[in-house]
Amino acid sequence: MTAFKSDFMNVLQSRGFIHQISDPDSLDALAAKGEVVAYVGYDCTAASLHVGHLLSIMMLHWLQATGNKPIALMGGGTTRVGDPSGRDETRKILTYEQIDANKESIKGTFSKFIKFGDGHSDALMADNAEWLTKLNYIEMLREIGRHFSINRMLTMDSVKLRLDREQELSFIEFNYMILQSYDFVELARRYKCNLQMGGSDQWGNIVTGVDLGRRMGTHQLHALTCPLLTTASGAKMGKTAAGAVWLNGDMLAPYDYWQYWRNTEDADVGRFLKLFTLLPMDEIERLSKLQGAEINDAKKILATEATALMHGREAADKAETTARTTFEQGGTAQDLPSVEISRGELDAGIGVLVAFAEKTGLVASNGEARRQIKAGGLKVNDAPVTDEKMTLTATDLSSDGVIKLSMGKKKHVLLRLA
């Protein structure tokens, strides 16, 4: 293990954030003096970031916590093009209105992890639409494009993998790495930025930006990537059978976010405590040694600490209490995720397949609902569903005015009268 001088590099190394660094000694020296200005770019392809983005956000947090300056770069410009990295097909082109709406929805996430302001290490937020949308095409080709080798661009994973699979790569996507590289140069000129961070799939684009900066006469630029995380079983972080694990509370309830972390595989608990919480390392080492049933205590701490960072301590504690009430005490917690239904719907009767598939999304389809019923996996008010033609009516309402639907032991939704 490399011995670094700076707190920033030591924290990243001890917690498992470092995958590749372009010039470790030079970057370490800058960080030791509090002179690193680093950015991570986030394209606005959805109304929320997801758990897969958390690694880079946590790196921005630790950068600031160790006295250096973070920049959160909104991809208002690059989203109009679409990043081909890790994609098997061309991204859907969003309207400018959709991009702007997504950008506004995403912005609030960062203030949970970093402090914005005018101080030395205070974070700033930038938007590459500010300079990319003003580029003149001919000038871009002359001043920027001449520094890029098509031969080298064709060797980049984001391009090469698509071509090797004989999958279409549009000209607009091919230009993405040029725009990302120019972002680095522009941030260097405007804000003295000297480091770009990102996932390991971005290494090629980032070092291309480092090279462009050298060719265009900026100060020395640096690259640092974190691993692309998968779980111990090989699943991609941030994805579940039900879809993406969103960070915005209006797209994924804090309770469901808590449950995502609570369901962490045993082999991942120690690693995730290092990456996704602010707990001190000695406490993490203690929790990582727990075995058998005791490891569930570590999982609850992981879930509560990760949820507190994203949604606040009150929401995290409420989620933990809801889980305890639901699973350990056998109750129907009012803080479970809920879906409103009308009195008219209930009076007419709601088919159990519709309730589980369409109303609550506990299952993906009517077919899956039927399979779960046969396997004994669906329950209404804690009673197994045995008849796929069952209809929910007002008689199924509890004294609290809700109907509890469950799939397995850990997925629950309440139907609540509007």
UniProtKB/Swiss-Prot annotation:
<feature type="short sequence motif" description="'KMSKS' region">
    <location>
        <begin position="236"/>
        <end position="240"/>
    </location>
</feature>
<feature type="binding site">
    <location>
        <position position="239"/>
    </location>
    <ligand>
        <name>ATP</name>
    </ligand>
</feature>
<feature type="binding site">
    <location>
        <position position="39"/>
    </location>
    <ligand>
        <name>L-tyrosine</name>
    </ligand>
</feature>
<dbReference type="GO" id="GO:0004831">
    <property type="term" value="F:tyrosine-tRNA ligase activity"/>
</dbReference>
<feature type="binding site">
    <location>
        <position position="180"/>
    </location>
    <ligand>
        <name>L-tyrosine</name>
    </ligand>
</feature>
<keyword id="KW-0067">ATP-binding</keyword>
<dbReference type="InterPro" id="IPR024107">
    <property type="entry name" value="Tyr-tRNA-ligase_bac_1"/>
</dbReference>
<keyword id="KW-0547">Nucleotide-binding</keyword>
<dbReference type="InterPro" id="IPR014729">
    <property type="entry name" value="Rossmann-like_a/b/a_fold"/>
</dbReference>
<dbReference type="InterPro" id="IPR002307">
    <property type="entry name" value="Tyr-tRNA-ligase"/>
</dbReference>
<dbReference type="Pfam" id="PF22421">
    <property type="entry name" value="SYY_C-terminal"/>
</dbReference>
<feature type="binding site">
    <location>
        <position position="176"/>
    </location>
    <ligand>
        <name>L-tyrosine</name>
    </ligand>
</feature>
<dbReference type="GO" id="GO:0003723">
    <property type="term" value="F:RNA binding"/>
</dbReference>
<keyword id="KW-0436">Ligase</keyword>
<dbReference type="InterPro" id="IPR002305">
    <property type="entry name" value="aa-tRNA-synth_Ic"/>
</dbReference>
<dbReference type="GO" id="GO:0005524">
    <property type="term" value="F:ATP binding"/>
</dbReference>
<keyword id="KW-0030">Aminoacyl-tRNA synthetase</keyword>
<protein>
    <recommendedName>
        <fullName>Tyrosine--tRNA ligase</fullName>
        <ecNumber>6.1.1.1</ecNumber>
    </recommendedName>
</protein>
<dbReference type="Pfam" id="PF00579">
    <property type="entry name" value="tRNA-synt_1b"/>
</dbReference>
<dbReference type="InterPro" id="IPR036986">
    <property type="entry name" value="S4_RNA-bd_sf"/>
</dbReference>
<keyword id="KW-0963">Cytoplasm</keyword>
<comment type="subunit">
    <text>Homodimer.</text>
</comment>
<dbReference type="GO" id="GO:0006437">
    <property type="term" value="P:tyrosyl-tRNA aminoacylation"/>
</dbReference>
<dbReference type="GO" id="GO:0005829">
    <property type="term" value="C:cytosol"/>
</dbReference>
<feature type="domain" description="S4 RNA-binding">
    <location>
        <begin position="350"/>
        <end position="418"/>
    </location>
</feature>
<comment type="function">
    <text>Catalyzes the attachment of tyrosine to tRNA(Tyr) in a two-step reaction: tyrosine is first activated by ATP to form Tyr-AMP and then transferred to the acceptor end of tRNA(Tyr).</text>
</comment>
<dbReference type="InterPro" id="IPR024088">
    <property type="entry name" value="Tyr-tRNA-ligase_bac-type"/>
</dbReference>
<feature type="short sequence motif" description="'HIGH' region">
    <location>
        <begin position="44"/>
        <end position="53"/>
    </location>
</feature>
<keyword id="KW-0694">RNA-binding</keyword>
<comment type="similarity">
    <text>Belongs to the class-I aminoacyl-tRNA synthetase family. TyrS type 1 subfamily.</text>
</comment>
<dbReference type="InterPro" id="IPR054608">
    <property type="entry name" value="SYY-like_C"/>
</dbReference>
<keyword id="KW-0648">Protein biosynthesis</keyword>
